[in-house]
Structure formats: structure tokens, C-alpha cells
Amino acid sequence: MNTERDSETTFDEDSQPNDEVVPYSDDETEDELEDQGPAVEPEQNRVNREVEKKKETFRKDCTWQVKANDRKFHEQPHFMNTKFFCIKESKYASNAIKTYKYNALTFLPMNLFEQFKRAANFYFLILLILQAIPQISTLAWYTTLVPLLLVLGITAIKDLVDDVARHKMDKEINNRTCEVIKDGRFKIIKWKDIQVGDVIRLKKNDFIPADILLLSSSEPNSLCYVETAELDGETNLKFKMALEITDQYLQIEDNLATFDGFIECEEPNNRLDKFTGTLFWRNQSFPLDADKILLRGCVIRNTDVCHGLVIFAGADTKIMKNSGKTRFKRTKIDYLMNYMVYTIIIVLILVSAGLAIGHAYWEAQIGNYSWYLYDGENATPSYRGFLNFWGYIIVLNTMVPISLYVSVEVIRLGQSHFINWDLQMYYAEKDTPAKSRTTTLNEQLGQIHYIFSDKTGTLTQNIMTFKKCCINGTIYGDHRDASQHSHSKIELVDFSWNEFADGKLAFYDHYLIEQIQSGKEPEVRQFFFLLSICHTVMVDRIDGQINYQAASPDEGALVNAARNFGFAFLARTQNTITVSELGTERTYSVLAILDFNSDRKRMSIIVRTPEGSIRLYCKGADTVIYERLHRMNPMKQETQDALDIFASETLRTLCLCYKEIEEKEFAEWNKKFMAASVASSNRDEALDKVYEEIERDLILLGATAIEDKLQDGVPETISKLAKADIKIWVLTGDKKETAENIGFACELLTEDTTICYGEDINSLLHTRMENQRNRGGVSAKFAPPAYEPFFPPGENRALIITGSWLNEILLEKKTKRSKILKLKFPRTEEERRMRSQSRRRLEEKKEQRQKNFVDLACECSAVICCRVTPKQKAMVVDLVKRYKKAITLAIGDGANDVNMIKTAHIGVGISGQEGMQAVMSSDYSFAQFRYLQRLLLVHGRWSYIRMCKFLRYFFYKNFAFTLVHFWYSFFNGYSAQTAYEDWFITLYNVLYSSLPVLLMGLLDQDVSDKLSLRFPGLYVVGQRDLLFNYKKFFVSLLHGVLTSMVLFFIPFGAYLQTVGQDGEAPSDYQSFAVTMASALVITVNFQIGLDTSYWTFVNAFSIFGSIALYFGIMFDFHSAGIHVLFPSAFQFTGTASNALRQPYIWLTIILTVAVCLLPVVAIRFLSMTIWPSESDKIQKHRKRLKAEEQWKRRQSVFRRGASSRRSAYAFSHQRGYADLISSGRSIRKKRSPLDAIIADGTAEYRRTVES
């Protein structure tokens, strides 16, 4: 017990997590963690590790081998794989692609097989087989076959149309042509004939036919421009660069034909931005990475000619590897609907069994003694009851609706199109409409509890502007600082003295320009020189003007800033970079580029100056830079203070530093660097370790501050969503101060919000864990008997936590002991048992702590997680899904949000400045965060209401229809006879009752879109599952049961002793069936009229049209002419005309319909009068609200200002944002009752009208 207590997460001063440290990377290995500090290692573990290392030397990650211009090499036996028995195929795929599923021979069997894998279709297939057995079925075979064929046919036609389109596309692509070296010369061949190892030639605007290694280009410096829109949706051009040696020697046809390079690289995979390989040629090895690979699907742009070597073809290409099936998401209603169908099946079996027992008893007591019922078979009552069980399964099968799933898909498809067509979610500035990328999740948009949002590019614009900087401890950039430098100018700086200035940078500090031009402080010039040289930006000249292509908006903003301040990046080759320094062009030799990635959080470049000295320039996050600074950096504290100021103003920061490198030191390091660059295994890890050796003892120059403005409408959107009881969590990689101020800017945080940080959270969780342990909560894996809140009720709390604290609190932090204690050799049984118990206790404690954290966080009105990795973003989403069982939505715009978007129930992508990775992984996409309120509060709520109404009505109408057979069975000896005509049973769900409910599921709306946005509190019905749950389900079933009783017993009583006008009794079975069927069709169609809130001509036409269609078909099917053609199928000859000419029959139908519907009308009236819902109240005052809205639009609205919480807040220089930032309004204030809101608005409107 003591050991367990000690293992609880507590911290002393030295071990406390650092809020500024980005937690371990997703790819961090155990070996890297072990290097973080010394530890006592057991001898056996050391031996085991050495053995593993020896084995590791024989392992290679690069097992894919390619030989240029040698097709026979790839046909060797050891490259052949066994596919089926003795049939073998090459390891290397052909370049022909096949995306279609069927051909002329396989379509019918394969499509039917796929459709019958669905449980509902298979169920009805079994019913159809049972109906073919005469001893069982009392129903004609076509009653099941026609609806089943209709469902199968609709799906098959859709699949066929899709597959024919795929056939055409495959044929078009495979028959494209390309120039390939064959027999020493370039020849034109089709794409499908290209093979791995071929050397190909591509020209401007050509599509790239396979994944190829760029060998040479007609552009200077071996550059090749490609457009990657088909891969990632991005339309801006990318730059690829060939190896210098191949570009130099492989320009002409003869040299390309004799090229015999050999490549070892990674196996085919779906990582678009990763490639590891080595080219062996001329007794040398050259490292290959993704920058030298042209991917299939891209287009050559602005490059006349380029040559490449095919590495991956056809199905092995990265674009094809990414075309696999995505994880299928299902809605909460899907699961509930399936459970309800299972419930109906159980009810069906129980009812059929009960009626079968009744038939066996009836046979024993009555049937066996009734000579006129003898059928020639001497079966026992038990056997007849057994056969009757299956007969009732067939008769009552319509309790399980065959068309339910098809109807649901049609409704969802229509709702998705409504989202796509919504012009109010169209962003005209970028011509970007909203896009529903899935058709299966629409109603779940109306049930969201938690939104997890990225910050940069989602809440903000991700348009970076250089605003401030700190150089050598001095802050530049704010016009208010001018007085400190004896200047009073506040106008914009004039950059006309600089020929390379782009004229777009708005900067106010004239003193910085004086410092640059005078050269009094060399660090200032060095600062901007670093920005101009330390990057991976590519330059292009359009109409004589410099145009930069940057990997990220931040990098582009910094290089453009350097350009405006006189240090313009002009050109680069593989080995040089040219910069204009205050008008003087200088070229530097590039010795190495230590590239940026999300784990390193920095990039460096090593250059040789024209004078011959070697320097390393580095820029990166302050957390990683400060760890690598030389101890003698006098301006560390001043720069840190500046970083804090920048963060308080929500500016994004980077630190800049450099170091001088001795020639000998660089030579030794370069050997390691070159070795790591061509490593066959773990190349990235090897390079990172080499980078670490040189990136140390750095000299700090200063820091940059970039502004990223808030998007339009973000505060209003967050406020609306909060009023809808949706909690918003912001997950970002930014600094804590920046994230906190963004929280205030978008009104997630307000002046009356009490903020809890990592230390507070850890203390609260520690106390809760202790209390639970004392009650036996952890070991028993049970929560306390009653939930105990962490905070007093009524307090407005927010939680801000960093990634480091998140790992500590959730016990997710990896430790170096994890591998040391992992013994390779067998342990004793006692050791295994103790290890197992210890591991189980740790897992239990971890699970309990995570649950407590989620409970604590969910009590807060806002949660902001900063300095978090993509993996942590997904982990936080998963925790809320797991422990709160709540519906989650994740929204982001970048590749680092993809994991989070895929983890959430619904993923939304913002098509912004960071490419299209998030959009391509999302379920819905649009251009601005503010459209989220319309997606949820309008489309989501409508879709949820429509789907709930549809399902409730669907179950009701099927039970009302089917259970008439149940009541009829009490009067026919439980003999599984049907109460209706066979053709009516066949067409009821297909024609007579299908269209109105489909239109209700597509078009119905309780209130307008404007009122939905004005009263976000209406949204809670979906969150609380108020419109579709087991209670509503059973109410619908009960309604159907009662309706079926009325439909049967009123006509039954009316027919019992009746004589018509002609003196004949109309109480025959066929007239009785017509009367019940007519009453049923009128009842269910009028019932949907009562359920409809939004009437259109289409709704009315569908209801009355369905009734008219029923009577038209009935009179046709009961005519003598069709009976003559098909006497066995149409046996109700003349029934409709004979029965419906009797006024008594019409009186019976009207009475039946009235008794079915009038109680519903009465109950609805009482409910809306005595217990009105929020929606009912708004509908009641709809005209007043509309008038009030029109009046408000005519009035000028004035707001009183308020003092700003941050006096140095620099989020925007435009008028109007200060009110949003500093209004002090709480987004969690208690809402007024809806009646009071309406009453106040009405009173105000009346007073204005009267005045």
C-alpha cells in the first residue's frame, strides 16, 4: 500500500513538468528515451540489448530494389510471389490500374453476394425461400419478392452506374501515352505497359504515370515544378529537385539509355510526404528523399522537359495505396435503430410462437373434429403448430420493414445535398462551398456535446504578418515604442528605398530601419540575414517580380519580412543560396540543411560564407532553442521577457540563433552526416542524432513575432454554440500565454472565469484519487456511490493545461525504465505473476485517473490544451468519447489535425492555408469556422428531427399495418391467414405509404433557419435524445398496436350483422379486406399530415396523391379484364366496385379513420397547451418573432465600450475587435427562459410601434 501511495503523481520543485516543453514525439523510441539520463541497467538486459543490436545490423528497411533500364532484373525468380497454389506473380505491380469491382460475368453474382451479406436482405431472402414451401406459406411469393427485388434493383443499378464510370476512367487512364526508353531510344507506349525500372520523359502539363525518381530537368538547378491537386487538393505549385550528378549527366537520350543506376528504397506505402532510399551509381551512393520523387497523379507545370526512373508502378504507387477504404463511421441513431429492429424480430418470433401454440391447441380442440377442414393429411396438432409458426413468420414479416434502410439512405443523401447547396455556407472570396463528404452522419450533427478545435487556421485566419521582433534584447515593431527612441512618427514605414520590397508589409517602427541602414548594431543585420537564408522557401520570378513558395505561412512571412527590410532571398541551387544584402548580391555555399519537422521544432542551415568561414543558422520554438544555447548568452532573460510580451498579445514566436563552426569540427561532423544520409535503416533517427551533435552552444540573436488574426464571426459562433450547451475545447501547439489570450479574444474565457492550470488540476486529482483509494474505489474499479463535483455549483471555471502536464496527469509519460525492466529471457512464474499484478494495478489506476480528469474537465465551461502533439489531440478526444459517451466533433485545417478529425465521431475540415489534408480526412468541410453554427444548429438539428420523425412514423405505420393479421388470427383458428389482399401487402410499403414519409424526412422543419440560430437552446433535444429513444420507440409501437385494433375491430363489428341497400350482406372476406385496407391507407397518410410541421405543395400532393394512387390501383386490380389475363394472381374481381358503392362501407371507413386520428389530435392539443416544448413556444409566437426581426433590422444598434483586459493586445488594427475581446460577457451565463425572451422582445416591439 505504501508503494502504491508513493507511486501517485506528485512533484518536487525539480521534477515538475515544464509548461513550455513540447511533450515527447509520437515516434520517440525507447532508446532515445534511455539517452535522456543515466540509469542502473541489469546485466542480463545489457546482454540482451547487445544481441538485439547485432541482429539489427542485418536488418534493412530498404528492401525494394530497382535497376534502371533492366526489365529482366525485376523478373528474377526471387522477386516472384505465390498468389494461388502454383500461380505466381511478380512482386512489382504492372502500371495498369483497376479500380472497378465487376465485369460482365461477375456483376450479377458478386453484387447479389455483397447485398445478401447485409442482414436485412438475407433475412428477406430466407422468407422468400419459406414462402416457396406450400405447407408453410399462406402468402403469394410475390408479396416478398417484389419489394425485395425493388430494394436489390435500386442498389444494383446504383452500383452498376458507379462501376461503369470506374471502367471508363480506368480505360482512359491506362491508355494514356508516355515516352519510355526502349531499345536505346524513346518510344511512345501506353501507361499500362510501363514497368518498374523504365526511364521516362515527361513534358509540360503531362500527368505523371507512376512514382518516379527525378533524374534531370530542363529548368536551371535541376528544379521541376509539379501540381499536386489530385493528391492533396493543393493548387499551389511544389518544387522537386534532382540529384546534382544525375541532372548533370542524364540530359541527353544516349546517356539516359545507358543509365544503369541501382536503387534500394522502402517498400511501397501510403506516406505521401516520406521517402527513404539510396541511389548506387558510379561506385558512389546518394541519399534519396521525398523532394526527389515525383508522384503519380501530379502534373508537370512550368517545366519544359524532365526525365525520371520508375520506382513504384500501378497499385504500388502512393496515390493508389491511399485509395483504400476509410474507417466507416456510424451514428448513434444507427446503433439505436439496429437494436430496435432486433427488438422487433424478437417480438415477431414471440408473437409467431404464441399464435403457433394457439393453432396447435385449436387443432386439438376444434380442427380435428371439423370434417369440412380435413385436408387429406393426418398431421398431429404439434406438427401443424410448427408449420404455422413459420407461416406466421411470413405473414407478420412486415413488422421488420424491408425498405427502412433504403429509405434512410435516400433521406441522408438528400440532406447531404442540402448542405452542399447552402449558399449561406459558401465562401465567395475563395469560391469554396460547404461540402458533405459523407452521407451517413447528418443527423448526428444535431447531437454534438463537445467540439474539439484547432487554433491556427481554424479559429484564426492563418495569414501570417510580421509584426514585431526582439533583437539583442530590444523590442521593435510597435509605433508606441517610437518615443523610446526619440521618435514621434506613427505613420507606416516607407520601404521605397528597397527595390525588392513588396509594398504589402505594414510596419510602424522607423527606428529599426535606421538601425539596419546605419549598421550601428551588427546583430540587427545578422537577424534579418538569418531570416533570408535559413529556410526551405523556393523562389520564382513572375513578370520580373520575386514570388516565394513556402512550406508554411510562418516561413513565408519571415522570408518576406527579411526581403522588405533589405535582405532579399534571390535564388538557390542544391549547393548555393543567393541573397541581396542591402542591394549587394552575395552567394553562399550550402553545406547542409537540417530540416524542420514537428518533433525537432526547429531547422538549421550550415553555410560557407564568401570569406570562407562556416556558420550554422538556426530558428525554432523557444523551448527547443533555449535548451541548446551557450551558457554565455547575456540576452536570454531579456528575450524571454519579450517572448512573454509577444505571447500576451497572441503573437506567434520563433527564436533565432547562430554559431561559428571550425573547419575541423565540420569535417568530422560531415562524415557522420553523410553516413546517416545513406543509412539503410532508421535513417530519420540517425539524422536526428547527428543534428543534435552540431546544434548546441548556440548564440541567441532574438525572436520574431507574427500576427495571425481571428477569423470573422468566431466569438459570435462560440457564444451561440455555448448557448446550445455545446462545450468547446481548444487543442493547440502554441504557447500557454498565446492560447490563453486567444481564449479571451474568442470569448471562451471571460473576466469572471476562474482558470485552473496544470498544478491545480494535479492537486485536485491527487485528492480525489486518495479519497477513492480510501473507499476502495481504484482496486474495485468502481466510482464513488454518488458523483461528487470537483467545484462548487454555479462557478464559471476554465481549464488550461499543457502537453507536458497532460502526460503527467494521465500517466501517459514514457519512462526510460520501461525497456530496462523488460527482460528478454523467461522469468520465473512468481516474477510473471508479480509483474502481471503490478501492470494490472497500474492500468486500473491510470484508467481511474483518466476518468477523473475527464469528469473534472467536463465541469469546466472551457478547456484549452496547449503545447500538445497530434497524438495528444486524438487522445483527448478519445478520452471524452470513452468516459462520457458523448458525441464529439473535431475541427481543424492542417495535417496535424487529421488524427483528431478521424478519432472524433464527426470530423470537420477547414479549407485554409495549410493544404487540404484535413479536408480530405474529414466528413464535412467549409472555408470558415463561423459556418459551424449553421451546420450544427440548422442542418444538424433539422436532420436529427427529420430522421427521428421518419423512424417513429415508419415503425408506427408498419405495426398498424401488420398487427391487423394478429387480431384476425383470433377468428380464423390461428391459421396464418392474411387480412388483406396479397397485392395490397406487396405495394403498401412500396407505393401507398412511402412517398409522404420520405418527403417529411427530407423537407420538414419545426422552425425556420433564422429562428434556429436565434434560439440555440432548441438544439438540446438532440443532445438529450428526446425525440428518438426506446421510450419513443415503444410509444410508436403502442400507437401502431392501438391503430391496428381500431382498423380491425370497427370494420369487424360493422360487418357482423349488416345488410346493404340491395338486401345482401356485404360481410364477405374480400369486402372486409378492402374496407380495412382503405381505412389503413387514409389513416396513415393523414397521420403523417398531423406529424408535418412545414407544409409545402409537394407534401400535400404526396399525401393525397398516395391515397388516390391506392384507389386507382385497387380498382384496376379488381377489374374483370386483369382477372381474365391472370386469374390466379388477381382474385378480388369486382370487390372494390361492389363494396365501395355501399354508403355503409364509407361510413365505416370514415368512422375508423376518425377513431384512429381524433385521440391523436386531442393529445397533441393538450400537450402543446399544457406542456409545450421550446419549439412549440416559438411556433406559437412565430409571426411576432418575424415582425420583431424585421423591426430590429431597421434599427441602428450601438454598443458601449469596455476596458481591455490586455492593454498591449495586438490582434487587429481594425476598429471593432476591442469590444469582442474585452466585453467581459460570460458565455456561460444562465439563459433566460424562452417565454421571457419572447415576452421581452414583444413588449419592446410594441413600445416602439406605439411611440
Swiss-Prot record:
Q: Which InterPro entries match?
A: ATPase_P-typ_cyto_dom_N, ATPase_P-typ_P_site, ATPase_P-typ_TM_dom_sf, ATPase_P-typ_transduc_dom_A_sf, HAD-like_sf, HAD_sf, P-type_ATPase_IV, P-type_ATPase_N
Relate the protein's function as given in its record: Catalytic component of a P4-ATPase flippase complex which catalyzes the hydrolysis of ATP coupled to the transport of phospholipids, in particular phosphatidylcholines (PC), from the outer to the inner leaflet of the plasma membrane. May participate in the establishment of the canalicular membrane integrity by ensuring asymmetric distribution of phospholipids in the canicular membrane. Thus may have a role in the regulation of bile acids transport into the canaliculus, uptake of bile acids from intestinal contents into intestinal mucosa or both and protect hepatocytes from bile salts.
UniProt membrane topology term = Multi-pass membrane protein
Where does the UniProt annotation locate this protein?
A: Cell membrane; Apical cell membrane; Cell projection, Stereocilium; Endoplasmic reticulum
Q: What is this protein called?
A: Phospholipid-transporting ATPase IC
- Extracellular side of membrane: 143-144, 361-385, 974-982, 1054-1071, 1116-1142
Q: Quaternary state and partners of this protein?
A: Component of a P4-ATPase flippase complex which consists of a catalytic alpha subunit ATP8B1 and an accessory beta subunit TMEM30A. The flippase ATP8B1:TMEM30A complex can form an intermediate phosphoenzyme in vitro. Also interacts with beta subunit TMEM30B.
Q: Which residues are glycosylated?
A: 368, 378
**Organism of this sequence:** Rattus norvegicus
Enumerate the residues binding ATP: 454-456, 555, 596, 619, 652, 732-734, 867, 873, 896-897
Q: Which residue spans traverse the membrane?
A: 122-142, 145-165, 340-360, 386-406, 953-973, 983-1003, 1033-1053, 1072-1092, 1095-1115, 1143-1163
Entry binding sites for Mg(2+) = 454, 456, 893, 897
Q: Which residues form the active site?
A: 454
Q: Which GO terms describe its molecular function?
A: aminophospholipid flippase activity; ATP binding; ATP hydrolysis activity; ATPase-coupled intramembrane lipid transporter activity; cardiolipin binding; lipid transporter activity; magnesium ion binding; phosphatidylcholine flippase activity
Q: Which cofactor does it need?
A: Mg(2+)
Q: Which residues lie on this side of the membrane: Cytoplasmic?
A: 1-121, 166-339, 407-952, 1004-1032, 1093-1094, 1164-1251
Gene Ontology process terms (BP): aminophospholipid transport; apical protein localization; bile acid and bile salt transport; bile acid metabolic process; Golgi organization; inner ear receptor cell development; negative regulation of DNA-templated transcription; organic anion transport
Documented EC number(s): 7.6.2.1
Q: Which GO terms describe its cellular component?
A: apical plasma membrane; brush border membrane; endoplasmic reticulum; Golgi apparatus; phospholipid-translocating ATPase complex; plasma membrane; stereocilium; trans-Golgi network
Acidic residues bias spans = 25-35
Pfam families, per this entry?
Answer: Cation_ATPase, E1-E2_ATPase, PhoLip_ATPase_C, PhoLip_ATPase_N
The similarity annotation says:
Belongs to the cation transport ATPase (P-type) (TC 3.A.3) family. Type IV subfamily.
